[in-house]
Amino acid sequence: MRDGVAIYPGTFDPFTRGHEDLVRRASLLFDQVVVGVAESRGKAPIFTLEERVEIAREVVKPFPNVRVAGFDGLLMDFLRAQNGRVILRGLRAVSDFEYEFQMAGMNRKLFPDVETVFLTPAEEYMFISATMVREIARLGGDVSKFVQPSVLTQLQQKVSSKR
């Protein structure tokens, strides 16, 4: 599986230790991993696209074969622009599987030369979601176990400015 470029797309709002774990493991499986940070206007992220790209770059710095790029539009257009051959997706629970399985099937119908590879998180990250991390942070809870210290600082600043 080493040859080729794998694209790990997501909103990453914020970039969690679960995301980082998946990137670390993917970096051992593929020659190159591109973290594709999606604009995701429909989700109304608390961080701007530029902020999310910078946060992700900071977190993935230790992985020499990983780079980060933002995108707006169709994932497949981004994948082609990055010369990607594989879409990486994380699966935490059965609910993730159902949605991701449908997406992988649709992508295979539309783009038969692109594969989707699913990775499950390490046990300690199984229940982390960026949505939960954001909500806990908004309510003043401690999310230090779920994000890197640099992410924590930015997240705390962002939620305190919105109160």
Swiss-Prot record:
Record-listed substrate binding positions: 11, 43, 75, 89
Annotated site (Transition state stabilizer): 19
GO terms (BP aspect): coenzyme A biosynthetic process
Name of the top EC class for this enzyme: transferase
UniProt keyword Zinc-finger present: no
Catalytic activity, as annotated: (R)-4'-phosphopantetheine + ATP + H(+) = 3'-dephospho-CoA + diphosphate
Cellular component, GO, one term: cytoplasm
EC number(s) on file: 2.7.7.3
Keyword Cytoplasm attributed: yes
InterPro entries assigned: Cyt_trans-like, PPAT, Rossmann-like_a/b/a_fold
GO molecular-function terms, A-Z: ATP binding; pantetheine-phosphate adenylyltransferase activity
Pathways per UniProt: Cofactor biosynthesis; coenzyme A biosynthesis; CoA from (R)-pantothenate: step 4/5
Primary role: Reversibly transfers an adenylyl group from ATP to 4'-phosphopantetheine, yielding dephospho-CoA (dPCoA) and pyrophosphate.
Family under the similarity heading: Belongs to the bacterial CoaD family.
Annotated protein name in UniProt: Phosphopantetheine adenylyltransferase
UniProt organism field: Azoarcus sp. (strain BH72)
Gene giving rise to this polypeptide: coaD
